Amino acid sequence: MSSYRIQGATGEWEVVIGLEVHAQVVSNAKLFSGASAAFGAEPNQSVSLVDAAMPGMLPVPNEECIRQAVKTGMALGAEINRWSRFDRKNYFYADLPQGYQISQLYHPLVGEGTITIDADEKAGIAEARTIGVERLHVEQDAGKLMHDQHPTRSYVDLNRSGVALMEIVSKPDMRSPSEAGAYLRKLRSILRYVGSCDGNMEEGSMRADVNVSVRKAGDPFGTRTETKNVNSIRFVMAAIESEANRQVDVIEGGGKIVQETRLYDPDRNETRSMRSKEDAHDYRYFPDPDLLPLELSEEFVAQCRAELPELPDAKRARYEGELGLPAYNAAVLTSDVETARWFEALLDAAGKPGAEVARAASNWLISDLFGALNRLGKAIDESPVSPRQGAELLALVADGTLSGTLAKQVFEIMLETGDDPARIVEERGLKQTSDTGAIEAVIAEVMAANADKVAEYRGGKDKLFGFFVGQTMKAMGGKANPGVVNELLKKTLG
């Protein structure tokens, strides 16, 4: 359990957090129409008559959206409901042309599941925790109001209207902003592995409604508020902290928390009231008369299960077990599906090597490649160096052609030019030398130039050995084999 507490005037307060995540389904078409679901089109260019709620237009469920939701439910270890139904959620807003949203209140497609978050001592998560998922249902997204096009008017863009969403509702099991952040990162990772949502919060394809309440430890749950449409993990964590502190101040000041919907203002780092929170009866839910219940066949469910990829937890266990990777490396490499794919392509290019080479490959990817990509501001799928080239570079180190220092030089040239490492080594004369005669000659020069330090070393100052190694390597332009240098220095220095 989290040790996170808010220190108030009357003592410590525990924070109770639940998240409702809206994840846009990856599909070519919308949930009930054939209009494109792609992001970025000009306003109102991806709108069918169904999306615009023209009279007489009937919705037809998109099987691919249902398939993606079922696979996501399976990835969460959740119960798949073979029978589910669509309901109408009735409310008026300018970006909702139908006057209602087609959702699933009473009989969702997916039942209870779980998400496991890892221990992270730096973030205050002392041990791995399992967070309950209450349900997953599919629903339509609304359109978008545009307030920056005219000084006195707002415009409506219906491109997003009718796009399929999965609403993934957690149980109120989280107790700190860090746990909420870890939950969202893990959920986003799972969605990307499945391929059901790209998890791009900046484009709005994944957003979170944040439910927060506070209580004294052991007390019943307090009254919760819901902060709507938070579009980054960092903002979710900040909104939780801000809202929890606000609630403590209100209660300790003699006030009461009102169940309401709030908005988070990242510029001021505070939440503000948007409207009183509605209950289900306020929306007058009833079964959608235009849609039959969804009944999934055994064959359809089995096909969805067969299409599931290896998920991050299973892949991580395999990396640790079969490849012998350290737990940290395995966690980093499996946290993002693109990173895992790149690493596996690297291993394939290296001829599916044993544990020693796999470990070296993971270290190189995490330290050298990640460092370079961060410096360049690129994602791993935009890497200037391919997995094949990475495998060739590692092979040149393994066979002694390159030292670690030379390999770093070659890698920098690869980043700049895109050339293969073997060609760079050949053209620039960067091959490591193990010529004992040449190395002995340089060692003799280094010792002659540093006779005082030789005397100190032979007098017992063993730490000076590293100085002689460094001077020798420097004199040879980093091309000497470090192992041979060490061996010859030990023999020469005595």
UniProtKB/Swiss-Prot annotation:
GO terms for molecular function: asparaginyl-tRNA synthase (glutamine-hydrolyzing) activity; ATP binding; glutaminyl-tRNA synthase (glutamine-hydrolyzing) activity. It catalyses: L-glutamyl-tRNA(Gln) + L-glutamine + ATP + H2O = L-glutaminyl-tRNA(Gln) + L-glutamate + ADP + phosphate + H(+); L-aspartyl-tRNA(Asn) + L-glutamine + ATP + H2O = L-asparaginyl-tRNA(Asn) + L-glutamate + ADP + phosphate + 2 H(+). Coiled coil: none annotated. Keywords: ATP-binding, Ligase, Nucleotide-binding, Protein biosynthesis. InterPro entries: Asn/Gln-tRNA_amidoTrfase_suB/E (IPR017959), Asn/Gln-tRNA_Trfase_suB/E_cat (IPR006075), Asn/Gln_amidotransferase (IPR018027), Asn/Gln_tRNA_amidoTrase-B-like (IPR003789), GatB (IPR004413), GatB_C_1 (IPR042114), GatB_Yqey_C_2 (IPR023168), Gln-tRNA_amidoTrfase_suB_CS (IPR017958). GO terms for biological process: glutaminyl-tRNAGln biosynthesis via transamidation; translation. Pfam families: GatB_N, GatB_Yqey. It is an enzyme of class 6 (ligase). SUPFAM superfamilies: GatB/YqeY motif, Glutamine synthetase/guanido kinase. PANTHER family: GLUTAMYL-TRNA GLN AMIDOTRANSFERASE SUBUNIT B MITOCHONDRIAL AND PROKARYOTIC PET112-RELATED, GLUTAMYL-TRNA(GLN) AMIDOTRANSFERASE SUBUNIT B, MITOCHONDRIAL. Heterotrimer of A, B and C subunits. Belongs to the GatB/GatE family. GatB subfamily. This is Aspartyl/glutamyl-tRNA(Asn/Gln) amidotransferase subunit B. It comes from Rhizorhabdus wittichii (strain DSM 6014 / CCUG 31198 / JCM 15750 / NBRC 105917 / EY 4224 / RW1). The gene is gatB.
